[in-house]
Amino acid sequence: MEKVKIYGDAVKNMPWKEKPEGFDGVVWRHDNNPIIDWNPTKKSARIFNSAVLPYEDGFIGVFRADHKNGRPQLHLGRSTDALNWDIEDEEIHWVDEQGNDYQPSYAYDPRLVKIEDTYYIVWCCDFGGAALGLGMTKDFKTFVRLENPFIPFNRNGVLFPRKVNDKFLLLSRPSDSGHTPFGDIFLSESPDLVHWGRHRRVMTKGGQGWWQGTKIGSGATPIETSEGWLMFYHGVSGTCNGFVYSMGAAILDKENPSKVLYRTRDYLLTPEKEYETTGFVPNVAFPCATLQDPETGRIAIYYGAADTYVAVAYAQVDELVKYIKENSELVDGDDVEYK
């Protein structure tokens, strides 16, 4: 297989650890996980399921912080090495497009992406039920809420890092108020981030992999590569001891991302370490963000662990893409090409 190219800017100072000797997987954990532990700020008991990006000479992050009253909000954080984070005590203050206060009653599971010169945040908020919130910032000082993309109920909203065929693209998972039925990933497009349509089912739960038999959800912002869009996602299995959240990956067609080219039959990472199996919600590995360096092919994956911690794992793009292609299983509906 030819060397896989990652498109984007170099990130030379991103975290990295070489694969442990004798390890036969393609995703391996950071030695000093978790990188964010219990009670990280005055207000919050737990931080997890959070998003990071390169910014200026370091890194910026939008973090899900579950406050000590149990209600989640989004907090801003900064770091010089993307491992040690200075997280603000107060939650992000939002305004509407006219500059009026527009604070969500709760906010969780953010995704963060830069498109051209603007940073966009997608999260889950209360909009007559759990729905996707959408906001923007140019400077991480003023945060403006835009129109909510969809009606309830919807979660796991992830914007692509550039327009495709001159349209913004958004992955999401429609559901009901219990957030478990349905369980498939959909793609929607918009010319202006206000009007959304051409909804397409991208990936379905199930198949031979029981680890993703209950539901799946898009994770980190898709990474543009020469092989297609590399997307990390979570898959959920139901057990007699509750849900188990594991990590998988798929490659979507570059020009028609509603079409799945390959997806992992087996999980890439599942809860095994104590910080993944024990916490506020046990047995969760929930990918939300990546850092990647085109020059080296290195990928750092940020994931929430046990709804309590932030953890990091690593992969090398050539090895990872090769593995996905050689260990792929499509589920009914994955390879449908909509007209």
Which ranges hold each PLM region?
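Beta-rich carbohydrate-recognition and catalytic domains
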Residues: 1-105, 113-158, 162-214, 223-280, ...
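Aromatic sugar-binding surface patches on proteins
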Residues: 284
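Catalytic core of Fe(II)/2-oxoglutarate
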Residues: 220
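C-terminal substrate/ligand-recognition segments
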Residues: 288, 292
